[in-house]
């Protein structure tokens, strides 16, 4: 889907064409996470808490892949708008080299030092034991993930979002089936609890990787080929590093900072951790539309900027922001609407249920803050290659404001859990003035392609 000159109404047609598959993909991801929590809910509160804490490493690693994929997507979307497929393959190889190296390192740490990893989040020995068994198996997942996430990012950058969605759908559906099998001991299998979740995830990601190679074999343009690992371009490597390193730093800094929320809550007790593990799942459902619009918008705007039409990109960015505000409001209402159902099925103790109720209500407004910032920082700004702003903005906001405030409130003032959580959830609104000012200046709109690479 190479994007050519568009009429005024084509913006919404192209946005929906890109957004719908991404929404489905994100909903599937949220549904699988929900299924994990629902099934672990019947295993016990400790299993939910341990997997929730151990999953912070997966979340950080995902943000590493997302940061690398951002640099690849920015370049590939603009070069696709220009019709340069050779440059896309070179960028794919560069990205794979980085992602595979990082995956290998993290997988080794997860296999040999899982207890040390869990100690970062909790002193509770039961949670450490459960989480360590989960992490050791997840090392296999990390190896597969490092390859598939790059290939899926390249597919999305050239508009093949439906194929990307189908591959994720395969992994997600298989994950749910295998989770049920290993958690509850279906089809004669033993009941493995949290360890079963890790096995199911590893197997589903392995199947997804095989499916990626099949799609690559059938594809006429974007392929997943080992030879791309050995294609070198000094110019494109420099461009990739210039775009990816700030994006990678931004995403990892934000993700690690967000994981620090779990550190704070983890030291406030297992009730807070268990409640938060359910809240994260519900919040992910509420933000599905916002993140889909940001992802689709970055692809669409990147294609337009690659053609050199910067004024049109600014016009489309304005419409995209309006869509995001509406999506944020809808997301908050979704969280509010499903809160009674979550409270009905949860089997937590009374204290954790109390935390759960009010944490969910806090997230009805938090989603709006996250929606606007995500659309602008991860969508609009990055489409034009402006990745440094997000790094500076999020790092200052999270590490100089939210994290110190959370630790101070929890361990110095010793405020109640819900007050600590409320203060942590003010981070998105603190950076609004800065983000909106940068958007209005319009310096983010740039054509980052080169005539010769």
What are these regions (language model features)?
Residues 17-36, 137, 148, 171, ...:
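Transmembrane helical elements of multi-pass membrane transporters/channels
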Residues 23, 27, 31, 35, ...:
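Generic alpha-helical transmembrane segments of integral inner-membrane proteins
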Residues 48-108, 145-164, 262, 275-339, ...:
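Small-residue-rich hydrophobic transmembrane alpha-helices
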